Amino acid sequence: MSRVEAVISDFGGVLTSPLLGSFAAFTESSGVSLEELGKAMAAVAARRGVNPLFDLETGRLSETEFLGSLAVQLTQQLGRPVELDGFGERYFAHLEPNEPLIDYMRELRGRGYRLAICTNNVREWEPLWRAMLPVDEIFDVVVDSAFEGTRKPERRIYDLTLERLGVAAGAALLIDDIEINCEAAREIGIRAVWFRSTQQAIQDTEAALGDGTGS
């Protein structure tokens, strides 16, 4: 098996605190439960024929359009007006950088590995998430689904990331908190670490790197 030359990190839930905490804070401030939010998403998806989150994360749907359709559905479900304006700002207000993992990425760069962020994200949120860590100081490549028109676990976003890193699939390792994204990466030959905790992810990454030195 080829030596790992590049490490690809997810953003939300890996380089940040768990996403569930931000969703929980939003539901508390809005009075909309996660269950109701999920029901609204499913109803909008049934009408559109596609999950609206997928279109949001591939730039086919703006944040305003996405939140507007959910607000209309939630208003119908709950029988009261629901406003979702400022969702992104409220969401990021409760998201914290995962400093130990960010420091580990910085260490890997110093050890000679090429680094990338491959994120399913929202076009309008780019200034918010980039403000959370020194992206350009640590990472060689950023692949953001909202600007590429493809999202994990679709193969094309992995291929784009590998191409921009200049490495073959067998020389790359992905760290992601979504298991299906890890499985999709493995299917094309990328090693993958399923992130469940910072300590576990670092240990599993070190084990996968083997000799601990990049090319």
Give a label for each model feature.
Residues 10-13, 59, 108, 117, ...:
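Generic structural signal for small/hydrophobic residues in well-ordered secondary structure
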Residues 91-96, 120-121, 150:
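Short, flexible loop segments at the rims of nucleotide/cofactor-binding pockets, characterized by
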Residues 60-61, 113, 147, 166:
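Residue-level recognition of short, well-ordered coil/turn positions
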Residues 2-102, 110, 207:
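N-terminal helical cap/lid subdomain that shapes the substrate entry/recognition surface
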Residues 1-5, 9, 122-123, 127-215:
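Asp-based, Mg2+/Mn2+-dependent phosphohydrolase catalytic module
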Residues 110-112, 189:
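Glycine-centered short loops/turns at secondary-structure junctions
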